[in-house]
Structure formats: C-alpha cells, structure tokens
Amino acid sequence: NFYQKTKNIIKLFSKMLEHKNVNFFGNINVGSDVSIEFISENYDAVVIASGAENDKKLNISGETKNGIYGSGQFVGWYNGNPIHSNLSPNFNCKNIVIIGNGNVALDCARVIAKTKEEFYQSDIMEYALSALNQSSVENIYII
C-alpha cells in the first residue's frame, strides 16, 4: 500500500511537470546559488514553499518584499483561511516563481496553472477563483 501511494505521488508530480508552462529547476539553493532579489526582479510573483507546517523563513535578503508569499499564506488564501483572506496575489503577470519542490509547492503550481474549466465544481474560495480566472500567468518556474 505504501508503494502504491508513492507510485501515485510520482504520477502526480510527473503529470504536473509535463504542463507546458511549468518549469522545474532543481539543486538550487536560494540565497547562495541565486538571490531572492534576482528572482523577484526577473519574475512577477514568488511563492516560498519550504515544506513546513508554518511558513519557514529562509533568512535571506528580500524575502519580505511585496508580492512574495509563504505557501501557507497562499494556500490559506485560496482555501479561505480568514487570516489570509486579504492577501492579494498578482496574477496579472507573465511569470511566477515557486521556491520549493514538495507537495505544497506543486499544489500551488497546480492551482495557479488551472484553467477556468478545471475549476468547475471546485471548493476554492470565490474571491480566489475570480482572481485566478483572470490570471494572465504564462509560465510557472519551480526552484
């Protein structure tokens, strides 16, 4: 059963990474290999998905700039957590970066990449659905 669950996760990751607008960059340490300043200057939005129950601070310069959100904030926003309901991610852009490559990072990418049709019968919050349906995002980069 554990093997089957692992196999299903691998299939999910593979399908996600096959999306034409999703790019994966592995073996990169944000803060030493590339700076958050470089990322935020070259991409329109950044989600930090560092695999923690609470958003993990990377302790790197620039991580608190506008338009940079922890994955917990972002997931909380589209799932209706009142603490994050006032978040206003900018999807009126071409490029988004997600820092992290775990399940939550891929969930964030999956939600951002969905089409209007794919949100049919979704339980996503109406305000998030409205923002995502107006998205002009063309590329999602996962680092």
Tell what function each PLM region has.
Residues D55-Q134:
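Glycine-rich dinucleotide-binding loop and its adjacent helix/turn
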